[in-house]
Amino acid sequence: ISVCELYGKLREDKAYRRHPGSLYRVFVRLGFRKKPESTKKKSKHTGTYDTPTSIGEKWQMDVKYVPNACYSGKDGQKFYQYTVIEEASRKRFLYAYEEHSSFSTVDFLKRAILFFGYAPGILQTDNGGEFTHPSKTSRIHPLDVFCNRYRIRHKLIRPRTPWHNGKVERSHRNDQERFYNDLRFYSFSDLQTQMKRYLYRSNNIPMAVLGWKSPNQVQKDLSGR
């Protein structure tokens, strides 16, 4: 369990009101976590980014390869995690697939719209084949067909600039630490079940960038419900 997650549980269940930094220092003092030496390099990407303040303005979508080490099967099957993040609240939807393809992408977007209860104004993705065709072809990608039908603007980031999809990229790093590092599953349906539980958990973890509220809390505040 992370300090952020513990902080959220203490605040909700025990009315804890001290700053999360105090809780982190207690963790370090008790030896549960060592203070890492600073290895952070200055970012080369200093441009500003305007995060939407209203839900439904913009989603980021990406796909993550599920590590082989998590799967106890012997058939060599591969699995993929599709992710969409609501930029304004950081609330996410995840779903597992056995392939990353245009079919999986469109199916996932349909499921995401049902999960959130609305479609985004803008859907931002990278230039992977599951999201777009090469620029040299005149064919229309199935994702673009779907987006055009529902008046969603499909925005592609520039090639080799993953930081432009930074929110969903960072969330995948958190998934590795909080979920995949300790995950063991024996079948595709088992992966789906465990991922569903993890999705509920992750959307309830407070985040510093959200003023120590969880994505679910911010989503509720912004939707007025």
For the regions a protein language model found, what residue spans apply to each?
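Basic, flexible linker segments flanking DNA-binding modules
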Residues: I1-W59, V63-V66, H141, V218-S223
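An active-site-proximal beta-strand-loop segment
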Residues: M61-F93, F103
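Acidic/histidine-rich, metal-coordinating catalytic segments
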Residues: H100, Y118-S135, R158-R160, W212-P215
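RNase H-like two-metal-ion nuclease catalytic core shared by retroviral integrases
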Residues: D126-N127, T137-C147, H154-E177, T193-K196, ...
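C-terminal domain-tail junction helix/linker
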Residues: Y150-I152, N174-R225
